[in-house]
């Protein structure tokens, strides 16, 4: 199977966790896009969705799936999204698509976070994929200097503005042995909106596309 076929397989496999009558948290990216395709087959059975990006919102609406503001819901039964990297503790790096802050908010609201990935995303230690950090524009240089102190090599992601009007620094050269500690440290830097480490709130279920089929990890 190609990588895209693996992504499609896990996107459709996630439908098993969607309960009729609920509002579904929906992520962003190529794998989440396959999940939206699958979710469209249940559009008459679910109340709607909360989306982590303008791109996902547009796709959901194109299928006629109602999209709610996160402030309109008290809780979400499920949140389905991909990851750029995931370790064996189900902690992740996310934010390659620059939607990390909204993704983190929806993950916090959701009772169950189902992460859908192909097997190339699994790693023993996080950090090979550059770690995205969403930053208030005026703090960009200061935050970059602070990230260097943590051993990182931050790079400004040019021509990218997040849906929240902020900028992204991608941090290279990190071997993340303690993801929770690093998440807390980076989040405490003035001017950081959030870091793309999902360690304090990791995944509850991982659906991993492999050459042998979809593997479920809980």
UniProtKB/Swiss-Prot annotation:
Pathway: Carbohydrate degradation; pentose phosphate pathway; D-ribose 5-phosphate from D-ribulose 5-phosphate (non-oxidative stage): step 1/1. GO terms for cellular component: cytosol. The active site is at residue 103. One of its GO terms (molecular function) is ribose-5-phosphate isomerase activity. The keyword Isomerase applies. Its EC number is 5.3.1.6. Substrate binds at residues 28-31, 81-84, 94-97, 121. Transmembrane segments: none annotated. This is Ribose-5-phosphate isomerase A. It comes from Proteus mirabilis (strain HI4320).
């Amino acid at each position: 199977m190609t990588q895209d076929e693996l992504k499609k397989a896990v996107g459709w496999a996630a439908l098993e966790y969607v309960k009729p009558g609920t509002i579904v948290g929906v992520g962003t990216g190529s794998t989440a896009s396959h999940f939206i395709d699958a979710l469209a087959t249940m559009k008459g059975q679910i109340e709607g969705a909360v989306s982590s990006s303008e791109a996902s919102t547009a796709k959901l609406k194109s299928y006629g799936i109602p999209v709610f503001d996160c402030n309109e819901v008290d809780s979400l039964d499920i949140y389905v999204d991909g990851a750029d990297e995931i370790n064996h503790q189900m902690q992740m790096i996310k934010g390659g698509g620059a939607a990390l802050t909204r993704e983190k908010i929806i993950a916090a609201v959701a009772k169950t976070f189902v992460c859908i990935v192909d097997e190339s995303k699994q790693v023993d230690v996080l950090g090979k994929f550059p770690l995205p950090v969403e930053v208030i524009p005026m703090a960009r240089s200061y935050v970059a200097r602070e990230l260097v102190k943590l051993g990182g090599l931050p790079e400004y992601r040019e021509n990218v503005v997040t849906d929240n009007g902020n900028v992204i620094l991608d941090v290279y050269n990190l071997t993340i042995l303690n993801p929770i500690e690093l998440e807390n440290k980076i989040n405490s830097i003035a001017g950081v909106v959030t870091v793309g480490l999902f360690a304090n709130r990791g995944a509850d279920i991982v659906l991993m596309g492999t050459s042998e089929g979809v593997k479920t990890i809980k």
